[in-house]
A protein has these predicted regions:
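Short, surface-exposed glycine/acidic/tryptophan-bearing loops
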Residues: 1-16
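Extracytoplasmic and endomembrane cell-envelope/extracellular-matrix remodeling and assembly machinery
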Residues: 14, 19-22, 26-47, 52-56, ...
């Protein structure tokens, strides 16, 4: 698994995340976030609207959770998440995620106010792009972890640029 959302190559492929020797969309925050959300929706549907099962399946795999449910049914045991025999990491993952969500929801944590302004933009590209100056690619590299071999941008569906530099980069491409 790789990237912010820890997508496996198979899941990435299923949700149309591009992977090549030049570009790994699992490392791209935009492509991977879209795929992770699509994957969660898929799991939520597969587990009949049970978010606990869906979250567990995101962590340990759909098949593993389905087997645990099937085993509990055979033994006449409840099939809710808390009664399933799952790996320790998964048994802790779901409650930790729920606790974090509850903290955010209850406003018990203070976060600094941020300006709600668009900071980045995506610039569609096709083919290959070669960034000429080191300054150009050094400013883009932290926003484009999916691009494997800077300064050459090959196979990427887009690049992420600071919104205040969008016109400048549009002129280059």
């Amino acid at each position: 698994a790789s990237g912010l959302w820890q997508l496996t190559p198979a899941i990435a492929k299923y949700f149309n995340v591009q992977i090549s020797p030049w570009y790994d969309g699992r490392q791209d925050v935009i492509d991977s976030t879209r795929a992770a959300l699509d994957f969660m929706e898929y799991l939520h549907t597969r587990f009949d609207g049970d978010w606990y099962h869906a979250i567990a399946a995101y962590n340990v795999g759909e098949g593993r959770v389905k087997r645990a449910i099937r085993n509990n049914k055979k033994q006449g045991k409840p099939t809710d998440f808390f009664n399933l025999k799952l790996p320790k990491q998964t048994s802790q993952y779901v409650p930790k995620l729920l606790a974090a969500a509850q903290l955010l929801k209850s406003n018990k944590m203070a976060f600094p106010a941020i300006n709600n302004q668009q900071a980045i933009a995506t610039l569609p590209i096709s083919g290959a792009v070669m960034l000429d100056s080191q300054q150009e690619w050094q400013s883009l590299e932290p926003l484009n972890y999916g691009v494997i071999r800077f300064p050459a941008i090959i196979d990427a569906p887009h690049i992420v640029v600071p919104v205040n530099k969008l016109a400048e980069f549009q002129g280059m491409l």
